Amino acid sequence: MITKLQAWSAGAIEMALLLAAAAVPVFVNFYGFHVFDLGKNAVVVSLALAVAVIGLVALIEGAGSGSLLGLTRALRRPLVAAAGLLALTTALATATSITPRLSLLGSQERAQGLVALLAVLALFGAAAWLARDEARRGRIVGMLLAGSVPVALYAVTQALGLEVVPGKVESASRVFGTIANPIFLGAYLMLLWPLALARVWQAVRDDRPVLFAGYAAVALLQLAALLLAGSRGPLFGLVAGLVVLVMAGGLASGRHGVAWGALGLVVAGAIFLALFNVPNSPLAPLRGAPVIGRFGRISETSSGSEAARLRIWRSVGRLLAGRPARLATGHGPEALKYALIPYAETYVAGRGQAGRLVDRSHNVLLDALAMTGILGALALLSVYGAWLWSAAVAAGLAPTAPDRRRLAMLLAAGTGLGASSWLAAPLYAGALTLLGLVAGLIVYFAWALVAGASRPSDAPADSQESSTDATRRLALALLAVGAAAVVEAAFGIQTVVTQVVFWMLAGVVVAVGAGDRIAAAVSDRAPAGVPRQRSRRSREHAAEPEPGGVTITWSAGGAALGMVAGAVLGLIVNDFVLYGTGLLADTLTVVVLLGLAALAAGWLVATDVGESRVAFLIVALIVFGLYVTLRVATWVAAQDASWVYAATVLWLVALVPVGGWWLRGAAAPNAPLGQGAVGILYPLLAIPAGVLVWVLAIQPVRADIYFQSAGANFDAAVKTDDATLFNVAEELFGRATRLNPREDVYYLLWGERYTRVGTAAADVTVAAPAFDKAQKMVAQAETLDPLMPYHTFNRGHLQLLFAQKLEAGSKQSIDAAANAAVALQQVFDKVPYDPQVANELALAKLVAGDSQGAIKLLEYSREQLDARNGQTYRLLGQAYYATDQTDKALEALQKAVAPGTSLAKQERFQVQLMLAEIARERGDLDTAIDHYEQLLAGGAGDWRILFNLGLVYRDKGNFEKSLAALSQTLQAAPDDASVRAQIQQALDSVLAKQGRGAIPGGGGGLP
């Protein structure tokens, strides 16, 4: 007999799935240093732990009703087995990782360790179990779509230039919504668009104009945001998914002409793309057009993102070839940036990446090979292949055993053919292997078209496929999603949000392939609020009022959907209405728009699945009000954003058991509460789960919030010279490091702040303590992460900065520079491809007096690393000038400021100043004057430039301009007696020249 606890478990797990579907994409933590994936993953892990604990309860409660037998049968399904294989290979890679802790917990930037994978696999298992029930499946897919609405709408507001929160953005030209990056936003929406189309088509079939209008609006909004993101990988994936959808739909419905047309479009599209990339083709003018123009630059592999991606792929290829012993298990999840360092090339893993070292190869298969080895890569391919096979079978495209074998063989053959490119074109093999998998699917469709076989509309009675038209249409959409995901994986990166969507939909694929349950495995009847044994269409109309009257209905399912919508409304407020930060002009407008859109999307889903819209709306507003009250109370009590975050996550977890009550399956009236004495142990399961939520999800993000707040206070203290703010910053930094003591980046960035303080100090005695503090911070970062050579680089860098603060040529300065050179040489030995490290080492040699060593190193950097690096030419000019090689110095300095080189404004000033000095020494006074005047016009306010300009005008005989420049110098010069005496001497010499002709006068110029 089904116990009441077992029935509740199913509802609670569904509630966790609905929250993950709708809340994770919209959640943003602007309080933290890592705004996006760290906080999102914390929510996923928290909900997944709830799923795991409640699932264990359900398994124990159902031990006597065949649950274990059902679990055994589920493991035999291809996609479930592939997911299990992926978990095992990832666990093995983590156990043998070069960075075990990082591989287990994930990085702060990506949050994609073993824990994150197990979390999304828990959601996968839950979806596979529950989505066999049509009502539950409808709610899960519906909330995935509803969750995309505020995300896509926020992206549109970004395109309109509406500012909601202050701070930096990932992309100023392309939208990114709440998903961190335009590429990631595009991939997320790509996964959902075929499902939106399926709902639109279902509304047409059911003659439901309200649903048609609603889902059409959702699809258009998603498409608009996807196009505004402008990322080619997701667009390629979407096109591939649509081609598969049309071909499969044509086959499934017997409209072979439609399928042939889709195949023809594939050929035409390939021809168009080829012509679009031919230089000087008639299509060339289109390359300047928005969105589509980027597809005309695919062949430009010498610059832009194409060149960067190919550099990464080459580097990963060298890594795989250079460490064959690691091919079995890989280097560990999240370990690519460490493994890649010895095998990278210029501007791949170099310091020039400014702290964002390449940690992904922009190809999911290459990531798997490098991080989880061949076993992990095979597991990944098996997941993709099993998805396509299972969805095609569920859609009725392979109804017989021979068809299924043929489909499996063609999928394997396409993958194998793509993989064979490792022998002929290894640079593109990762992409071609994935594309080959989809090609195998299309070849199967082509075979079916040539064979002329019409797919039967009804599956055999003993098959595992769904027997309803609506379910088959969903299977077709899921097949398109799978194809899109595989194509995008050839060029993209996995993220927290895309992983959540991918694995939840993978669970739906398993459920659809298994067929709808006549009697739910956890229930004697349908879930609460959904009438049993009613058709989808009749259920959809159940909530509509009868003609001539108004009927107010209540359903538990509608209330549960309202809870999810209320949670999303609360998160929108949490995202953009920040304590301690004033509202921008557009904040409230955007928040209201997003809230209304989220509410409308939830209402649409409630209408679609036949739940009460009244219950939905009432509960949504109540839950929203309760959360706002909780948030305000937490802030008033703690005055601490980290506790607001903690309260938010715990609030989401607390909604799970409450929603489970509304979504519970039915038990017999006389059913027991539980299985007896074993139920006493259930509350004990919550203790380790709660500890894990606190340790894995809440504490790291609280630390991140404290660190961000510490940085803001530190910067404000430096700007205002406020000792109180400085003490607050130090106290907050201490909290951050106590909560997350293993995060080396905190120490690194704190050291960089002290380095800036020391560099800006006017006096060495003030600078020395700051540099000493910075040295300690960087040393701690080195201790925590000894595999990262750029911590050593930062140690050498700050030593060099301190050397430059000391008196030039002094023993102390030379010794400090020599120490810096030792550290920088250690780094350069590990990354000889990095121009910035080479330049920094060369500068250390220059300051230490080793000009010839600096020249040799800089010439190597120019000839072997980057022939257009402005820093290299600037330092070469300085080194040549120091060794009296004036002609070479002049040539190098001119190249340093040539078009196409990148130098900071202050560095360009330094180059122009050296060019002016060289021209002056050579007697080319006009050129010297031009350089000095350009410096002054560009904003260089150094009094020494005015002084030297005055002397050049004097030497040229332009005494009026000389007097003007020297008079301004006297006003701008520091209050130093010797300096002012030298300026006055120069003025006297000009006055003497005006009165008596050529009279020897002072003023030799200041360097």
Task: List the predicted regions and their residue ranges.
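TPR/TPR-like (Sel1-like) alpha-helical repeat modules
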Residues: 894-899, 954, 959-977
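Soluble catalytic regions of membrane-associated enzymes that act on cell-envelope
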Residues: 321, 694-883, 894
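Register position in tetratricopeptide repeats
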Residues: 756, 801, 847, 882, ...
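Hydrophobic alpha-helical transmembrane segments in integral membrane proteins
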Residues: 275-289, 574-579, 632-642, 663-720, ...
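Flexible juxtamembrane loops connecting transmembrane helices in multi-pass membrane enzymes
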Residues: 174-175, 238-242, 261, 272-327, ...
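Helix-start (N-cap) detector for alpha-helical repeat units in TPR-like alpha-solenoids
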Residues: 233, 703, 744-745, 789-790, ...
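TM-adjacent membrane-interface loops and short helices in multi-pass inner/ER membrane proteins
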Residues: 181, 301, 308-358, 365, ...
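Alpha-helical transmembrane segments of multi-pass inner-membrane proteins
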Residues: 1-27, 44-58, 83-100, 113-284, ...
